[in-house]
Regions:
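Extreme N-terminal starter segment of soluble prokaryotic enzymes
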Residues: 10-11
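Membrane-interfacial amphipathic/re-entrant helices at transmembrane-helix boundaries
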Residues: 6-7
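Glycine-rich, positively charged N-terminal anion/phosphate-binding segment
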Residues: 1-3, 17-92
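An anion-binding catalytic pocket shared by soluble metabolic enzymes
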Residues: 14
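Conserved small/polar residues in nucleotide/adenosyl-binding loops
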Residues: 99-106
Length: 106
């Protein structure tokens, strides 16, 4: 399977799961055959605020490739900044952007 020029050499891909797909879980899944790993959903606003706990969600294990970071939010400017932060802090091959409707909390 290919995502653009990125080749995934396994038919198994890890789905993003909030509170589950931390770096240790992703490494176990890769060792068991997952050919593609992805972080849990990460808030673009938390990345834009450089929240330490949120930045820790970007951690990768050595050799974690191909790998993706999944970011959600409703502010296009913050989403763009968060994508850049994710690339700088993670080394991910793919950044998935999930745009949401603005809510009263935004």
């Amino acid at each position: 399977m290919n995502i653009g020029t990125l080749t995934i050499n396994s038919s198994l891909a890890l789905a993003p799961m909030a509170g589950v797909t931390d770096v240790a879980f992703r490494q176990i899944c890769a060792e068991l055959g997952a050919g593609y790993t992805i972080t849990e959903l990460i808030s673009s606003k938390a990345l834009c605020y450089h929240d330490k706990k949120t930045l820790s969600l970007l951690q990768q294990f050595p050799g974690e490739h191909p790998a993706a970071v999944q970011i959600f939010g409703s502010d296009p400017i913050c989403m763009a900044e968060a994508a850049q932060i994710a690339l700088e802090h993670s080394g991910a091959d793919v950044v998935c952007l999930l745009y949401t409707s603005p809510s009263p909390r935004d």
